[in-house]
Every structure is written in structure tokens, then in C-alpha cells.
Amino acid sequence: MHILGIDPGSRNCGYAIINYAPHVNSLKLIEAGIIKIKERDLQTQIMEFVEGIDLVIKNIHIDEVAIEDIFFAYNPQSVIKLAQFRGALSLKILQEIGNFSEYTPLQVKKAITGNGKADKTQVAFMVKRILGLKGEIKPLDITDAIAIAITHSQRIKTNDVHSTPNLQRAMPLKSLSANPSKGCI
């Protein structure tokens, strides 16, 4: 099974494809790289980003996709720009693959190192150790993408891939009404 891990960014997008064999619990790095996005107008940048993702998807058959979720940032403009890239990425993945999973940086760090507050060097060390890689992986966007793919493989192993742990219903879905007079939406 090929898992594509993506660390989206508005300047650099890290990606990694790992082969996961669940029956023998084996992980192997197939390909990893960076999609560099040049400083241009936003529409051109988004097109370059999507074209880069398209090349990755069309080059190797992908079974599962895992994307790092948007996290808190101090600059609202950066978050808005990243959200636009994420929207384009989400649409492309849905069109080509059919679905994807998302993981927060905290979830990835905890899955890879056991510590949700681990720094990037600790994550990089564990990624290399898990995959048995020698040498340094640069830039860290690639390491993050590999870590995201590994995190997804762990969720597959525990059959927890498509769960929604944050979803809590106060009442059964069938009892919700579209009638505003009843106070439900």
C-alpha cells in the first residue's frame, strides 16, 4: 500500500510516499521531495502547487493520502493563504484519490516520538530510525511529510483511520430538524 504524506505550505510543500505492508508491518520510503512555489501572484502559485501534486500522484499509484492539518499561526494572512492552498490540495486529492486523512502536528509528533511537544530534530531522528535511513533528510518539510505518512500507517494498523474522535452528537442524527421553530438547524 502506497501512502502519500503531505506537509502543505505556501512556499514549500513537502511530500513523501512510503510503502506500507500491513501484514508484515513493514515501512519503506519510496520517494520524497519538495514542491517549491515561486513568489508570484496567488493564482499562479496555487496552480504551480496543484500541478506539482498532480505530478506526484500521477507518477506512482497512491492508495492513501495523509495531510498535515492547519495549525495556529501568529499571522492571519499566512493562515488565510495556507487555507487557500489547502483547499486546492483537498479538491485535487478528492478528485484523484477519493479521500484523505488529516493529522495535527501534535498528533504526528506523538505518533512518531511519543511526545506531542517534540521538536523537529527529535521527529527527524525518529523518522530516520523508524525507516532505517542513514544521513540527514533536508529540508525538514520532507521529514514532516514522511512523519505524516508514517502516522497514517500507524492509524491503519490500529484500524483507526476514518474515525472522527472530535465528533460528539448530543442527540441522534434523525432527531435533528431543519425547522427553525424547533430550535434546531
UniProtKB/Swiss-Prot annotation:
The RuvA-RuvB-RuvC complex processes Holliday junction (HJ) DNA during genetic recombination and DNA repair. Endonuclease that resolves HJ intermediates. Cleaves cruciform DNA by making single-stranded nicks across the HJ at symmetrical positions within the homologous arms, yielding a 5'-phosphate and a 3'-hydroxyl group; requires a central core of homology in the junction. The consensus cleavage sequence is 5'-(A/T)TT(C/G)-3'. Cleavage occurs on the 3'-side of the TT dinucleotide at the point of strand exchange. Its main location: cytoplasm. This is Crossover junction endodeoxyribonuclease RuvC. Mg(2+) 1 binds at D7, D141. The active site is at D7, E68, D141. The gene is ruvC. Mg(2+) 2 binds at E68. It is found in: Cytoplasm. It is an enzyme of class 3 (hydrolase). GO terms for molecular function: crossover junction DNA endonuclease activity; DNA binding; magnesium ion binding. The keyword Transferase does not apply. Belongs to the RuvC family. HAMAP family: RuvC. Its cofactor is Mg(2+). Keywords: Cytoplasm, DNA damage, DNA recombination, DNA repair, DNA-binding, Endonuclease, Hydrolase, Magnesium, Metal-binding, Nuclease. Its EC number is 3.1.21.10. PANTHER family: CROSSOVER JUNCTION ENDODEOXYRIBONUCLEASE RUVC. InterPro entries: RNaseH-like_sf (IPR012337), RNaseH_sf (IPR036397), X-over_junc_endoDNase_Mg_BS (IPR020563), X-over_junc_endoDNase_RuvC (IPR002176). Homodimer which binds Holliday junction (HJ) DNA. The HJ becomes 2-fold symmetrical on binding to RuvC with unstacked arms; it has a different conformation from HJ DNA in complex with RuvA. In the full resolvosome a probable DNA-RuvA(4)-RuvB(12)-RuvC(2) complex forms which resolves the HJ. The lineage of its organism: Bacteria, Pseudomonadati, Campylobacterota, Epsilonproteobacteria, Campylobacterales. Gene3D superfamilies: Ribonuclease H-like superfamily/Ribonuclease H. Binds 2 Mg(2+) ion per subunit. One of its GO terms (biological process) is DNA repair. It comes from the Bacteria. It catalyses: Endonucleolytic cleavage at a junction such as a reciprocal single-stranded crossover between two homologous DNA duplexes (Holliday junction). GO terms for cellular component: cytoplasm; Holliday junction resolvase complex. SUPFAM superfamilies: Ribonuclease H-like.
